A protein has these predicted regions:
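Helix-terminus/linker motif at the lipid-water interface of multi-pass membrane proteins
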Residues: 32, 36-58, 126-133, 189-196, ...
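Small-residue hotspots at the loop-to-helix junctions and early N-terminal turns
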Residues: 54-65, 139, 143, 202, ...
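Short alpha-helical transmembrane segments in multi-pass integral membrane proteins
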Residues: 1-24, 85-149, 182, 193-249, ...
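Short runs within selected transmembrane alpha-helices of multi-pass transporters and secretion channels
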Residues: 75-78, 145-164, 172-180, 201-216, ...
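Small-residue-rich hydrophobic transmembrane alpha-helices
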Residues: 57-116, 120, 153-172, 266, ...
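Transmembrane helical elements of multi-pass membrane transporters/channels
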Residues: 22-42, 145, 156, 179, ...
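N-terminal transmembrane alpha-helices
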Residues: 11-43, 47-51, 65-80, 84, ...
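Transmembrane alpha-helix boundary and packing residues in multipass membrane permease domains
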Residues: 27, 31, 43, 83, ...
């Protein structure tokens, strides 16, 4: 069934106050659905793996930092496709749209390289993460099988970026919703019935993502939108590839930096004992929802600015940032009030132990208010990326997030070994990042720079 162009969100005309939430909320729902699928898989593997339940959960959990690092890198790369295609649509450059779309589809082939490297380096990578010897066989098995899904995961994310560049955000959500139901169903067959353990969970993930990627590919073949895919045109275009990598690689590194920094923090948390680990894990589940909501406005900012920059509607680019800051701020404030206000009650649903609830609430009170800073720098970063400025926000994130968190864990934490102390690094690093991101926007001032360039060109 072909999609009609009327289903997309018009980013260059109409109300930004209405269109940005219409874009952002399906993006947020897609990310939250992915987290929900992973959470349910963990519950299934923990409850239906017999005597190996705890070991199986540890095996899957020990892979999270590694898989998150890879996924963040490549999902960031897909943002490059989003910006390049959105900008070309704004310029009405259908030739570049076509070349960028078909190049993006083939970029998912990088997933096969990841499979090959993963098969070779699975155990060395897990050893570097200090995975215990008794967990290593299952952890290595899970990673090797999970990596088989990498081409499908990459293809899905590049396809989703293509659809979002033209303002179609519900379709990736619908495809993922179907695959999530399939994933949970397969988990319930492969683990409790067939007793495949961690391999069953990884196989279910691979099948589910293959279905979602295939669904979006078929839609791209049938769509009457400008991003339609024609198999005979599938080729890597050097110009399109260079533009995508120029924006996408720094964005991918920026996302991966968070994963690296969080690995370091998690190692410090682990050193404080099992109770702290359990409390921190429960609170972290709430953070994913909040972060995905805020990040969806950043993605909206990137895409809307990209299209309007291409269409030379620079005033609308600036207004996009303002709208994203206001609406993202409202979402952030609402989430902070609800979670902090009901934090103890929500945490008790994960674990009724009063001590664990109290420890988890320390994390809630430390991190959730700091998401106000996160909202600022995510939207500022998205604004710069929409203008094609991707390296600057990546460098700021690397220095302010990774640098401060590394320093805190290795230089401050050893002298004050408390959970509250390690949690302080979040507001400090996020606040510093937000400050320098605002400075970067004021110094780069892409809208003013664009107008000055156009004025000089006109004068000639």
């Amino acid at each position: 069934m072909a999609d009609t162009v009327s289903k997309h969100i018009d980013m260059t005309t109409g109300s930004l106050w209405r269109n940005i939430p219409l874009f952002a909320f399906p993006v947020a729902a897609t990310s939250i659905l992915e987290q929900l699928s992973n959470l349910i898989a963990t519950v299934i593997i923990g409850n239906f793996s017999g005597d190996q339940g705890t070991l199986a959960m540890a095996a899957v959990g020990s892979n999270v930092p590694l898989t998150s690092l890879m996924l963040n890198l490549f999902i960031g790369m897909s943002l490059g496709s989003n910006v390049v295609i959105a900008n070309a649509i704004g310029r009405n450059d259908q030739n570049m749209v076509k070349r960028a779309v078909h190049t993006s589809i083939l970029m998912a082939l990088v997933g096969f390289v990841v499979i090959a490297l993963g098969e070779i380096f699975a155990e060395p990578m897990l050893t570097a993460l200090n995975v215990p010897a008794e967990t290593m066989p299952l952890a290595s098995l899970y990673l090797r099988v999970f990596l088989l899904s990498m081409p499908s995961i990459l293809l899905y994310n590049f396809e989703a970026a293509i659809f979002r560049s033209v303002g179609i955000t519900r379709m990736p959500l619908q495809a993922l919703a179907v695959s999530t139901v399939l994933n949970i169903g397969l988990d319930l067959i492969f683990v409790p019935v067939l007793h495949w353990g961690v391999a069953g969970v990884a196989i279910a993930t691979a099948i589910a993502y293959t279905v979602s990627a295939a669904t979006l590919f078929i839609r791209l073949l049938k769509t009457d939108s400008v991003v339609r895919v024609t198999p005979r045109d599938l080729a890597i275009d050097p110009v399109a590839l260079k533009r995508i990598v120029k924006i996408g690689l720094p964005a991918g590194i920026q996302s991966a930096v968070f994963a690296v920094a969080n690995i370091i923090i998690q190692s410090a948390i682990n050193s404080l004992g099992t109770e702290v680990m359990a409390a921190s894990s429960a609170a972290m589940s709430l953070e994913y929802v909040c972060y995905n909501l805020l990040n969806s406005f950043s993605q909206a900012c990137t895409t809307f600015v990209g299209q309007n920059h291409g269409a030379r509607q620079i005033d609308r680019c600036t207004k996009t940032l303002k709208v994203c800051l206001v609406e993202g701020g409202i979402v952030a404030l609402t989430t902070i009030i609800v979670i902090v206000g009901l934090g103890r009650e929500i945490l008790s649903l994960f674990n009724s132990d009063p001590n664990i609830v109290s420890i988890g609430y320390i994390r809630v009170c430390s991190i959730f208010p700091a998401y106000a800073f996160s909202m600022f720098y995510e939207n500022m970063s998205g604004y710069l990326r929409g203008f094609g400025i991707s390296l600057t926000p990546a460098l700021i994130t690397m220095i302010c997030v990774c640098g401060i968190r590394f320093y805190w864990v290795f230089c401050v934490f050893p002298h004050f070994r408390t959970f509250a102390n390690i949690m302080m690094v979040y507001p400090i690093s996020l606040g510093t990042t937000a400050f320098f991101m605002v400075v970067a926007v004021l110094l780069c001032h892409p809208a003013r720079t664009y107008r000055a360039t156009q004025a000089k060109a006109t004068a000639r």
